[in-house]
Amino acid sequence: MDNKTYEISSAEWEVMNIIWMKKYASANNIIEEIQMQKDWSPKTIRTLITRLYKKGFIDRKKDNKIFQYYSLVEESDIKYKTSKNFINKVYKGGFNSLVLNFVEKEDLSQDEIEELRNILNKK
């Protein structure tokens, strides 16, 4: 997966979040979970599962004639690499520009400011 670009759609994130939460999930399990929150057809959800499988984000194993899907990527890794891709595209790789943009535009609480200071002090 290291040579992949980690391009993943918002809809694919929904599927990945369920797989990370459950560790192993059949297509029907994934469909049930998503349909509790979204009005997506089973066919749409199966298409998303197939895309993630073809992209190499998930794999499957047969368990009593039913495929159980599981993640091939750690949640923290894909979040990091997706964020890094975003920073490279939007901020030309300048992480400090990203942070500065958010700090200037967001109303941060004292707790959030203190948390940021603690994180930076650890570096």
Swiss-Prot record:
Site positions for Cleavage, renumbered to this chain? 101-102
- Gene3D superfamilies from the UniProt entry: Penicillinase repressor domain (1.10.4040.10), Winged helix-like DNA-binding domain superfamily/Winged helix DNA-binding domain (1.10.10.10)
- GO cellular component annotations, sorted alphabetically? cytoplasm
Q: Which InterPro entries match?
A: BlaI_family (IPR005650), WH-like_DNA-bd_sf (IPR036388), WH_DNA-bd_sf (IPR036390)
Q: Where is this region: Important for dimerization?
A: 74-123
Q: Which UniProt keywords apply?
A: Antibiotic resistance, Cytoplasm, DNA-binding, Repressor, Transcription, Transcription regulation
Q: Whereabouts does the entry annotate DNA binding, in residue ranges? A: 7-71
Report the domain of life of the source organism: Bacteria
Query: What are the coiled-coil residue ranges?
Result: none
Q: What are the GO BP annotations of this UniProt entry?
A: negative regulation of DNA-templated transcription; response to antibiotic
Q: Cellular location of this protein?
A: Cytoplasm
Q: What is its main location?
A: cytoplasm
What does the PTM comment of the record read? Upon exposure to beta-lactams, proteolytic cleavage at a single site impairs dimerization and abolishes repressor activity.
SUPFAM superfamilies on file: Winged helix' DNA-binding domain
UniProt entry tagged with the keyword DNA-binding: yes
Q: What are the GO MF terms of this UniProt record?
A: DNA binding
State the function annotated in the UniProt record.
Answer: Transcriptional repressor that constitutively blocks the transcription of the gene for the penicillin-binding protein MecA. Binds palindromic DNA with the sequence 5'-TACA-[AT]-N-TGTA-3'. Regulates genes involved in antibiotic resistance. Binds DNA as a dimer.
Q: Which family does the UniProt entry place this protein in? A: Belongs to the BlaI transcriptional regulatory family.
State whether it acts alone or in a complex, and with which partners, per the record: Monomer and homodimer.
The protein depicted here goes by the name Methicillin resistance regulatory protein MecI
